[in-house]
């Protein structure tokens, strides 16, 4: 183990030695000689052969030569400590290599280098993690999770290679964002435009930025984008973002209001509502999304009704929407969305987008 640990350490400091060698060539020659010896030892270990004991002794003698002269009785315990530290170095190095490989595979298959907490990965797109952010798991649970993540990564490889058809995951009533309805200066998507799917949580800031990016880039004009609102639920049964469940219920209630109507009679309160939440601001300049999250349940409900009135909803519309948001129909829609998200699309974070035959984790970036 001493030989392998020495090779790891020598390999890591190689770049610094290369710089020093410019000024001290003898130092560089001594380093390369030691590195070759260490590599020869590693090669023998790989071939299940014994390392040269003289190299191991050379390493120990270099480290202990002053101790031998001054404190000879310390040599044996210090030699044992060197062996232990060598084992630790090798284990840590192997763990680091495996973790790096796992992170790269996760980034390729799942779109995040951190399977459990996608939002903690700085290499992927911005995303809201599922479930609780805090990690109070003990060492055994963390170790078990480390191995479980390998299974998740390999299980995701077929999904990474498959051709994703967004329309397969639509849930009725399907809400297609009409850019023309949101902004008269924009064009509505053509009937033959490709389909796309946005799986969003109305309280997630990454979802807000993703929606804005799509709106500004013309994505809603070039694609027929279906919106599925999926309020992230915590382990205790509550919701990650305040009032996201309420907003989702109102969203699907307004979608049901247009169900069965001819295109010219549809009111598009659903698209207008999600547009207001993701792009709007209060008179004081606060983002509508964060404003709704700061309200109590009853206050948020009253504010949503005010939004609908702004969109032209009549008293009859408001009564029907209030009835629908508590109905079994909306509960069934949310259950179908949950099933599509967790069991069919197998999301690892929000937003999750499907377009151009691929599944994408994180906010849309043009």
What are these regions (language model features)?
Residues 1-53:
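Hydrophobic alpha-helical segments
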Residues 8-13, 45, 83-94:
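Hydrophobic alpha-helical membrane-embedded or membrane-associated segments
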Residues 21-24, 91-109:
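Membrane-interface motif at the C-terminal end of an N-terminal transmembrane signal
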Residues 45-61, 121-131:
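Cytosolic juxtamembrane regulatory segments of multi-pass membrane proteins
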Residues 58-93:
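Loop-to-transmembrane boundary segments
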Residues 103-245, 326, 330-346:
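Extracytoplasmic thiol/disulfide redox context detector
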Residues 208-301, 305, 348:
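Structural alpha/beta surface segment adjacent to cysteine/selenocysteine redox centers
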Residues 298, 302-366:
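C-terminal cap of thioredoxin/glutaredoxin-like
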């Amino acid at each position: 183990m001493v030989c392998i640990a020495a090779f790891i350490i020598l390999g890591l400091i190689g770049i610094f030695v290369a710089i020093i060698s410019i000024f001290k060539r003898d130092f560089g020659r001594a380093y390369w000689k030691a590195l070759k010896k260490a590599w020869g030892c590693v090669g023998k270990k790989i071939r299940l052969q014994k390392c040269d004991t003289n190299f191991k002794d050379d390493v120990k003698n270099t480290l202990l030569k002053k101790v031998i002269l001054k404190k000879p009785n310390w040599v044996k315990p210090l030699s044992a400590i060197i062996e232990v530290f060598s084992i630790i170095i090798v284990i840590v190095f192997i763990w680091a290599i495996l973790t790096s490989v796992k992170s790269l595979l996760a980034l390729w298959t799942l779109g995040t280098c951190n399977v459990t907490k996608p939002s903690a990965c700085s290499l992927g797109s911005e995303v809201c993690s599922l479930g609780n952010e805090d990690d109070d798991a003990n060492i055994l649970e963390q170790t078990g999770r480390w191995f479980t993540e390998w299974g998740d990564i390999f299980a995701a490889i077929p999904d990474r290679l498959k051709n994703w058809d967004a329309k397969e995951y639509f849930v009725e009533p399907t809400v297609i964002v009409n850019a023309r309805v949101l902004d008269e200066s924009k064009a509505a998507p053509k009937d033959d435009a490709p389909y796309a799917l946005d799986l969003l949580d109305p309280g997630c800031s990454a979802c807000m930025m993703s929606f804005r990016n799509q709106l500004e880039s013309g994505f809603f004009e070039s694609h027929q984008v279906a919106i599925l609102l999926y309020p992230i639920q915590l382990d205790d049964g509550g919701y990650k973002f305040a009032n996201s469940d309420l907003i989702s219920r109102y969203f699907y209630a307004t979608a049901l209001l247009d169900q069965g109507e001819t295109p010219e009679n549809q009111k598009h309160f659903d698209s207008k509502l999600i547009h207001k939440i993701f792009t709007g601001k209060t008179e004081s300049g606060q983002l509508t999304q964060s404003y709704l999250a700061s309200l109590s349940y009853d206050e948020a409900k009253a504010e949503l009704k005010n939004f609908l009135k702004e969109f032209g909803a009549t008293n009859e519309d408001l009564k029907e929407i209030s009835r629908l948001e508590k109905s079994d129909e909306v509960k069934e829609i949310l259950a179908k969305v949950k099933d599509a998200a967790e069991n069919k699309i197998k999301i690892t974070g929000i937003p999750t987008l499907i377009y151009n035959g691929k599944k994408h984790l994180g906010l849309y970036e043009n």
